Amino acid sequence: MKNYYLIALIISFSFSFAQTETEIRAIKSNLDLDVLEQVSFEEIQNEIAREKRVTKFLMLNPSIERIEYSGNTIQRIYDIIEGTPIYQSTDNAEAAIGTRTNFIQVGGDMNLNLEGENMRISIWEVGGKTQSTHVEFNDTGESRIEFGDSGNDVTFHSTHVSGTLVAAGINEDAKGMAPKATLGSYTTNSVFSPLSTEIISNALLLSNHSYGVPVIGNNGTAPTWLMGAYNNDARSWDNLLHAAPTHLAVFSAGNSGNDQYSGGLADGFDKLVGEKNSKNTLTVANASSVNLGSEGQVLFGLVNMNSSSSRGPTDDGRVKPDITGMGTNIFSTGVGSDTAYGPATGTSMSAPNVAGSILLLQELYNDTNNQYMLAATAKALVCGTASDGGVNGPDATYGWGLMNSKKAAETILGEASESSLISEQSLLNGESLVFDVTACGSVDLVSAIPW
């Protein structure tokens, strides 16, 4: 079995880009096409089985609607477990500042001028797609939003998430993390098959998934065993991403932080469901505010967490969520007109803050190394360079901390001066790899090893 490891040794102290056919072929060479096809087929069978269970339940309960709308929140019956409907629920300048992404964007202090040009990210959303006609997506004369499946319904949620990712900055306060990237807009009616197609056809590096199963849905509390469990949804995502090691799926942690239920691991914790507990996904929590110094350092050693952000850990003790982004009162694109904007709060907003920032880090890594990071490398880079949110070290609230795009970019650039090391290696059972490093003593020596 081949495992890939990253060693990122982090010492604290204008590029151009085009994704070429050669680069796309290099990404595709890492894919296990047979396994991708098999996982997609299995998930299609799971989708058919879920649809049968939901259809039968709705026939027996005609007063219950499959999709319900409450303000900007959408809840859709996803499955029936133990006779109970399981709901799937919808979970930019301030966001960029919080994760220090403004340092690596155009005009940032690092003079990197990263914009995500000629790069792509796709999103899956409950209930509808992105308003592609919005001015923020039409700055080039044609929309940078591409619809990947059928259906014409647009939603505020999808449009807001898309803006956080790729809004051009016509309104500077609503500028997205990667304002020149293109975006594929899908609904969650089907995920694995179109995602696999995107990965194979477009060498897709990143996807954003701001949805999930809440602890308390329209029909009450989800079965207690679901919270923190490594269930079939989590396993399916791990299988898919193992076959596509270049692709990182970013998930919102959920907004069940204030919900109470009996039988959890600890009061206030154990509120992550399904794919949020997958090993290979990146699960994002929601910070409400942070005080930063001029160099992007966290002042007073505290990142304020939004109380609604769902906490881990997983039932088997792994650190989840993985990372924290800014998702409180985020100003982004809206619906109703092509110049509509508005604020929104939730891990649905912090996830695209993180996903779009990682897209820029992939752009930078390719500029400096002529290749893109594997998903595990990108994940370790983000987690290994994050700013502690409260207590030192990882925890079930912040994960590894608040994303620090500036520190991550410095780590990529630091390889040239040997102040950092990013290494992707294959390691067989029983083998060992040895890296000799020298710590200067005045700053922390940090390592992150994923597989």
How would you label these PLM feature ranges?
Residues 185, 363-442:
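C-terminal subdomain of the subtilisin-like protease fold in secreted/lumenal serine endopeptidases
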Residues 446-451:
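Short amphipathic, basic-aromatic surface patches that mediate peripheral association
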Residues 324-392:
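Hydrolase catalytic cores
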Residues 19-22, 92-207, 216-218, 243-248, ...:
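Subtilisin-like serine protease catalytic core
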Residues 124, 129-139, 287-352:
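Catalytic-core environment of secreted peptidases
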Residues 21-23, 168-172, 185-280, 291, ...:
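Substrate-binding/access-modulating region of protease and related hydrolase catalytic domains
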Residues 25-123, 146-154, 238-242, 265-267, ...:
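N-terminal domain-start motif of subtilase-like serine proteases
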